[in-house]
Amino acid sequence: MISMKRRMLLGSAGVALAAPMIMTRAAVAQQSGAETSMDIDHAMPPETHRFNVGKFEVVVVKDGARPSEKPQETFGTNQSPETVGALLEANFLPADKFVNSFAPVLVNTGSDVILFDTGLGEGGRQNGLGRLVEGLTAAGYKREDVTTVVITHMHGDHIGGLMEGGQPAFPNARYVTGQAEYDFWVDPARVGTPAENGQKGVLANVKPMAEKMTFIGDGGAVVSGITGMAAFGHSPGHMIYRIESEGRQLVLTADTANHFVLSLQRPDWEVRFDMDKAAAAATRSKVFDMLATDKLAFLGYHMPFPAVGFVEKVDQGYRFVPKAYQFDI
């Protein structure tokens, strides 16, 4: 098993070796006259965040971030643009723009190195995304160290990094995913439907690993201390995962909520990417009611990096409370 000392040394070396490239990219951005905070973010080494859940080490990697306009076309699609904009402004956010970030997670149990989702991979790199492997390297992990890859669901921003150059990106890994999710996406009935394009990605990136896959359902174990929970709606077999070690817990909520304001404060608002919008809304309320009631920490794939926090029940939904030093003491 890779040691903490080695990880820290490798992480420091990665930053040092990256420095000339950072300077080159920054210089190019400045010369273009169009440098933004996103340009700077893409030029820097990928952000990583490390903390412990009991004896388990958790490393969050920022695979990238993508700014977009017209948030009401993605979130609150059953609301007026004015209503969506007003909620954003009430939370000190612009009414006409939003940023979507992507946060795969690695959990080192001491005997297993488990990666949850793989980001956008090669297809995102021309836009400054797909930085998972780069981030893992900065954190002291090689692709070969990963023993298990868990796929929460099979949308492109979660499975895009499964393959690298036509070969498995994590060559020593076995794979775990939900049975219902896999069955939906490989079904030939998807051809000719809105899911056909997504199916192409699954057939290219997921199906080649089918012989190395373990399929689970609600309550299925990945390893001791990590349990799958059905959270259907965002996709037909969307799964979330409870991590527990030495009495500490963290729930990986994947895409149950995709925005820390628009999805959490208004869990009943429809989201364009939710495949079954009514089921997704019901799942949001169920999952975040549990987290708020039990005061459990969660990590959401699209929450503001490092994507970890808690939720407090408020009038119409939930308030996101970012992680501070709870896991450090």
Predicted regions located by residue number:
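Active-site metal-binding loops of divalent metal-dependent hydrolases
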Residues: D63-G64, T118-G121, M154, A180-E181, ...
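Divalent metal-coordination and catalytic microenvironments
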Residues: K55, V107, D117, V146, ...
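Active-site metal-binding motif and surrounding structural segment of the metallo-beta-lactamase
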Residues: D96, P104, Q126-V176
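N-terminal export signals
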Residues: I2-S3, M8-Q30
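Cap/insert and terminal regions of metallo-dependent hydrolase folds
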Residues: K5, E246-I329
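Conserved beta-strand hairpin/beta-sheet module of binuclear metal-dependent hydrolase folds
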Residues: E47-A139, I240-T256
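Metallo-beta-lactamase
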Residues: G135-Y141, D145, N172-A230, A282-K286, ...
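C-terminal segment of N-terminal export signals and the immediately downstream linker at the start
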Residues: M23-V59
